[in-house]
């Protein structure tokens, strides 16, 4: 059977204990077969449509761009069942796991969105589900923890390291290496060991495919730029995939600058990391002078990741995509602005992409441009975090 490319340029690969290689090989073969099976594809597309609610809307911002010559559209992944883009690829991987005869699903989660999406897919498809989550993230995302439990998932707190996403990833991988005969590791982003970055991209590419059709319908042309936030990078690669060959469309990824790139409190490895091996892949990584993984930081739990998917690293290296960053404060401003001006409360992750678009518009208000921001999720999970921050600032 032909195999998928394990690398994107120099990035990617499969840096895992030998015991996991057969499991990854089996997964790759099953994925290639499923991609060529019309019955599998139909089942996946039907679930996206009739269960998850695709296609999602492409919404023109009515008020945010007043007084400028920009048209700004939002790709509304916040309207997807489960509240974020995560549901797309989780349904794909869960179907794939079932096809492979697996009975259990292991997952990791940061903001809890991937955990919720995994829990709902497992409930729907009759699979047992256990989710590893950093103890710190469990504290800041309690509504999502309860959602997972409601849908029958077991949530396992991780107290090691920084008690956040990277530690949950390590524990999930450790579990899988002991249980892969009966369990599938449902990785939540377009990163990790091959073939995960490719599988996740292919199950997310519907975002960009729909956007292309919708924008041509509404505007008669492709956008000047598509903009998405980047933690591990799955919502961004889902938006970018169908536009990579459209050379006139700029691809812009937005990393979290946290408290500022001049501090240690950020999560921007693409621009401020060094090449390293982490989470089964070779990719830019936040490291200290001894090569140890540095803690990343972002106000948004879902972007709080010290590395980035290998295809993003490659797109950055060859100059096909550009990657900027946005601070906590800029993201919080965009979060409030979208709520006030358009009546849409975005996820803090998505607010980073919106903030970057607003900076582009502000820099050149007279420029005629057509922009699409991937609004990757809704902000229900973040209202308590934002409330506490604004309260502390005396803004409320």
Swiss-Prot record:
The keyword Lyase applies. Its cofactor is pyridoxal 5'-phosphate. Pathway: Amino-acid biosynthesis; L-tryptophan biosynthesis; L-tryptophan from chorismate: step 5/5. GO terms for cellular component: cytoplasm. Pfam families: PALP. Its EC number is 4.2.1.20. Belongs to the TrpB family. PANTHER family: TRYPTOPHAN SYNTHASE (PTHR48077:SF3), TRYPTOPHAN SYNTHASE-RELATED (PTHR48077). This is Tryptophan synthase beta chain. It comes from Photobacterium profundum (strain SS9). The gene is trpB.
């Amino acid at each position: 059977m032909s195999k998928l490319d394990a690398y994107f340029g120099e990035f990617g690969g499969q840096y895992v204990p030998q015991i996991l290689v057969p499991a990854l090989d089996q997964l790759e073969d099953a994925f290639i077969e499923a991609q060529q099976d019309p019955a599998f594809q139909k089942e996946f597309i039907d679930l996206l449509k009739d269960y998850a609610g695709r296609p999602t809307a492409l919404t023109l911002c009515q008020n945010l761009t007043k007084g400028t010559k920009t048209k700004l559209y939002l790709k509304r992944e916040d309207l997807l069942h489960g509240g974020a883009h995560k549901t797309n690829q989780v349904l794909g991987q869960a179907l794939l796991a079932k096809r492979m005869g697996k009975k259990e699903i292991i997952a990791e989660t940061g903001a809890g969105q991937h955990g919720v999406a995994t829990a709902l897919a497992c409930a729907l498809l009759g699979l047992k589900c256990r989710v590893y989550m950093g103890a710190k993230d469990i504290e800041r995302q309690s509504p999502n923890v309860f959602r997972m439990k409601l849908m029958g998932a077991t949530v396992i707190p991780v107290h090691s390291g920084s008690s956040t996403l990277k530690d949950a990833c390590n524990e999930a991988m450790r579990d899988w290496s002991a249980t892969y005969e009966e369990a599938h590791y449902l990785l939540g982003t377009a990163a990790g060991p091959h073939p995960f970055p490719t599988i996740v991209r292919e199950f997310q590419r519907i975002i960009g495919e729909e956007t292309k059709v919708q924008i041509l319908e509404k505007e008669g042309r492709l956008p000047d730029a598509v903009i998405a936030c980047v933690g591990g990078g799955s919502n961004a690669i889902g938006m970018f995939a169908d536009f990579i060959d459209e050379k006139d469309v700029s691809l812009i990824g937005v990393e979290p600058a946290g408290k500022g790139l001049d501090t240690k409190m950020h999560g921007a490895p693409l621009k401020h990391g060094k090449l390293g091996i982490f989470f089964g892949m070779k990719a830019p990584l936040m490291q200290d002078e001894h090569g140890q993984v540095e803690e990343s930081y972002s106000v948004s739990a879902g972007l709080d990741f010290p590395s980035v998917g290998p295809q993003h690293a490659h797109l950055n290296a060859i100059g096909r995509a550009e990657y900027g960053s946005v601070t906590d404060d800029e993201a919080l401003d965009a979060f409030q602005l979208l709520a006030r001006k358009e009546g849409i409360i975005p996820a803090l992750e998505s607010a980073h992409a919106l903030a970057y678009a607003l900076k582009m518009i502000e820099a050149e208000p007279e420029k005629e441009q057509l922009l699409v921001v991937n609004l990757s999720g809704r902000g229900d999970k973040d209202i308590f975090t934002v409330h506490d921050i604004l309260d502390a600032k005396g803004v409320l």
